[in-house]
Amino acid sequence: ASDLIGQAEHDNLAQCILISKDKSLIDKVQNEISKQLKEILRSSIARQSLSSNGILMHISSDKKIIEVVNKIAPEHLELNLKNYKSFIPKIKNAGSICLGKYAVMAMTDYNVGSNHILPTNGSAKYSSGVSVNEFYKRISYINLSKKGIESLGPSVITLANYEGLAGHAQSV
């Protein structure tokens, strides 16, 4: 419950989702959220976020859970499971993944050195957190031999003509 509230109190657009195979856990979390919201400073923001973007979801199979997680592509994913290691190779879309019950999102925000600039709103499907690579200037170097252009050129001409870029095609 605290982890969901911790995400929800960021702003009213924060996405806060719990997925569990245990229906009784979902009920306990729902009740605990109600209790904890009475005690936090940013309760109005957290309430709005949970109301519009909060979901407590019961899914009975690990396979379906993984499918849903990869579709959601969360900014933060907490695998609060004993068998979290079996999930790791199957999760393809998440900004960061907290492993086990002690690796909570608040630790990633403030203390453990992971990146706090993460892809939001499902953009973890095609993007990663900001890294030092974003601050490197890179140059691509291309060198072709006569044999290389003769081999690759026809496909470039076809694509250029298809796109209506005659100058591109003629340059080959």
Task: Name each model feature, range by range.
Residues A1-K64:
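ALDH superfamily catalytic-core signature
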Residues E32, V68-K71:
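Short amphipathic alpha-helices in soluble, non-transmembrane regions
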Residues A46, I66, Y110-V112:
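A short alpha-helix capping/helix-coil boundary motif
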Residues K63-I66, M105:
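A short acidic, often aromatic-flanked loop/helix-cap motif at beta-alpha or helix-coil junctions
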Residues N70-V172:
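C-terminal core of ALDH-fold dehydrogenases
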